[in-house]
Amino acid sequence: MVKKIGVLTSGGDAPGMNAAVRGVVRTALTEGLEVFGIHDGYLGLVEDRIEKLERHSVSDMINRGGTFLGSARFPEFKEVAVREKAIENLKKHDIDALIVIGGDGSYMGAKKLTEMGYPCIGLPGTIDNDIAGTDYTIGYLTALNTVIDAIDRLRDTSSSHQRISIVEVMGRHCGDLTLMSAIAGGCEYVITPETGLNKEALIQNIQDGIAKGKKHAIIAITELMTDVNQLAKEIEAETGRETRATVLGHIQRGGQPGAFDRILASRMGNYGVKLLIDGHGGRCVGIQNEQLVHHDIIDAIENMRRPEKLELYKVAEELF
C-alpha cells in the first residue's frame, strides 16, 4: 500500500509543470499520503535533494511558468549503478512510488526504474507534443500561443518591409508545434520533419507567389532541420526578396501556462496519484478524446506511435 510518494520534473521545462506538481501534492495530501519533492530531476534524486512538501509548498504555483522543483538533463541515469543509488535514496525516505513529469527522456528514466521493480507514473510535460498515448502534452498549447504571438508580430514587420520571414519553432523530431502555429498564424509555408525540406520546391513556390503579387511571406520550420540563417540567404539570393530568419528558442518554454494547460496538468496530477492508490505502477497518463487514460509505460515507449496528422497537413496545404 502506497503511503509516501515522490514527484519530480525532468528534461526541458514546460508551462504547466507547477500546476501538475500542485495537482499531485494537493491530491496526495487529501488522500492521507505524504509527498516528497525531488529537486532538479533525476540528478537531484541521485544526489538526495529531497524535501517533504505540504499544501502551502504549492500555494501560488498554478499560474507560474517553469518548475519550482527545478529540472536537469542527466544522461548518466542510463547507468544501472546510478539508478540503484536513486532507488537507495527513495528507500531512505520510505518513498513507495514516484511520479515523473517530463518528456520522452524522462519517461525512459521512469521505464528503467519500473523495470527495476520501482513503481512510477509518467505525466507528459513537454511543449513538443511528441509523447505517444496522449492527444496533448502539458505545456504544448501554451507554447503554441507563444509561437502564434511571435508570428503575428513578425507579420506586422514583414508586411511593412515586403520581407520574407523564416520562423524556427521547437519540436525536435515532431512537427506538431510548427504545423499548428503555421495554420493559426496564417503562414504561407510550413516545413516539418514529417514533410521534409525541399529547398528547390520551396523557392519555386515563393517565386510563384511573388509573380502573383505576393508582397511578403512567413515560413514556419521545425528546429534542427537546417541552418535557417543559411536558408534565408539562399532564398534571398534566388528570389531577390529580403529574407530574415528568427529563432524563437527557449522563449517558447517560458511564461504563464494558459487555462487549458493549468486544467490539464491539474487533472493529470490528480489522476496519477489515484492510479498509485489503486495499485497501478509503471503507467503513463494521457488524454484522448477528452478522457484521461493510462498506458503501460514500457509499451508506450517501445511500441506505441503517435497518429499522423494527415488531415491537418491537407488543410495547411489548401490554406497556404
Curated annotation (Swiss-Prot):
It is found in: Cytoplasm. Its EC number is 2.7.1.11. Allosterically activated by ADP and other diphosphonucleosides, and allosterically inhibited by phosphoenolpyruvate. GO terms for cellular component: 6-phosphofructokinase complex. ATP binds at G12, R73, F74, G103, D104, G105, S106. ADP binds at R22, G23, V24, V25, R26, R155, G186, C187, E188, K212, K214, K215, H216. Its cofactor is Mg(2+). The keyword Nucleotide-binding applies. Its main location: cytoplasm. Pfam families: PFK (PF00365). It catalyses: beta-D-fructose 6-phosphate + ATP = beta-D-fructose 1,6-bisphosphate + ADP + H(+). GO terms for molecular function: 6-phosphofructokinase activity; AMP binding; ATP binding; fructose-6-phosphate binding; identical protein binding; metal ion binding; monosaccharide binding. Substrate binds at T126, I127, D128, R163, M170, G171, R172, E223, R244, H250, I251, Q252, R253. Pathway: Carbohydrate degradation; glycolysis; D-glyceraldehyde 3-phosphate and glycerone phosphate from D-glucose: step 3/4. Keywords: Allosteric enzyme, ATP-binding, Cytoplasm, Glycolysis, Kinase, Magnesium, Metal-binding, Nucleotide-binding, Transferase. The active site is at D128. PROSITE patterns: PHOSPHOFRUCTOKINASE. GO terms for biological process: canonical glycolysis; fructose 1,6-bisphosphate metabolic process; fructose 6-phosphate metabolic process. It comes from the Bacteria. Mg(2+) binds at D104. Homotetramer. Belongs to the phosphofructokinase type A (PFKA) family. ATP-dependent PFK group I subfamily. Prokaryotic clade 'B1' sub-subfamily. Catalyzes the phosphorylation of D-fructose 6-phosphate to fructose 1,6-bisphosphate by ATP, the first committing step of glycolysis. This is ATP-dependent 6-phosphofructokinase. The gene is pfkA.
